[in-house]
Design a protein with these regions (language model features):
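Rhodanese-like catalytic fold shared by cysteine-dependent sulfurtransferases
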Residues: 1-18, 46-144, 148-170
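A contiguous, basic/glycine-rich beta-loop/short-helix subdomain that forms a polymer-engagement track
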Residues: 18-29
Length: 170
């Protein structure tokens, strides 16, 4: 019961005023990318754009749909959060959703347009079609195939030798 009271008291600090994280510059964020307590949570809607160019080490949790599920799976209780958003009008809603699931260490936010000046700190993710995998493995037998689907999907059908780890567990 005491733990519940402490939790409720902790949440009540936001009962009247939601935190308002400030807009950060790209240089402020880049300067902290190597800090293990900082997580960049990229909330933009366009998954293909995220895969093409995102800040090194950032996690993708699109603002729509299962944002809270993804964020709750990816984030640790002591991590500081920087949001990457499509537009400034999304910040308040994403902050509210993070607060509701217990994450209040929101350092600030960055508009997706700022990534254009993130020289040298952008990463990309190559998407591979299922039919391309055998050729990749033949080319390099040490290729690790990581199947990030849910357990039921993996058990129904998967590539021999693939390691199954749901994306929410990475």
């Amino acid at each position: 019961m005491l733990l519940r009271q402490i939790y409720d008291a902790d949440l009540s600090q936001y009962a009247y005023r939601m935190p308002e994280p400030r807009q950060l510059t790209i240089d402020e964020v880049i300067g902290q990318l190597d800090d293990p307590t900082l997580v960049v949570l990229d909330t933009r809607a366009d998954r293909a754009a995220f895969m093409k160019a995102h800040l090194r080490g950032s996690l993708y949790a699109p603002a729509k749909g299962s944002f809270s599920d993804f964020a709750g799976s990816y984030l640790g209780p002591d991590e500081r959060i920087v949001l990457v958003v499509d537009s400034a009008d999304q910040v308040e809603e994403q902050v509210r959703r993070l607060i509701r699931i217990g994450f209040d260490k929101i350092e600030g936010w960055l508009g997706v347009a700022a990534l254009a000046s993130a020289n040298g700190t952008l990463a990309s993710i190559r998407s591979v079609k299922f039919r391309e995998v055998p050729a990749l493995i033949a080319e390099d037998p040490d290729t690790l195939v990581l199947d990030v689907r849910g357990t039921a999907e993996y058990e129904a059908r998967h590539i021999r030798g693939a390691l199954s780890v749901a994306h929410t567990r990475l």
